[in-house]
Amino acid sequence: MKYNLSLLEFLILKQLYVDGFNYLVRDIDNNLCAYKDYPKFWNDTWIPISDWYDLEAFNNIFDFVGYEEPIAVKDVLSDYNCDEAD
């Protein structure tokens, strides 16, 4: 399943993983993956900036504290749904 920005808006409105960082989201292998806004990502030439969504425009930003690798949004949503069932 290919997610779109509206799913991210839903997750953000649910106030999941909120903190003060900016995050970048990119479609990788049909999954939206979120990265912290580390300077090294801007410097990597294999990342076309036009392929990224800057979440800074939203009021609340995903908090993937401690992760430098991409996090698949579908995994975050699955974890959230499991938490809701408990």
Show which residues each predicted segment covers:
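Surface-exposed ligand/attachment interfaces on beta-rich extracellular proteins
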Residues: 6-18
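Short, surface-exposed beta-edge/turn micro-motifs
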Residues: 19-23, 29-31
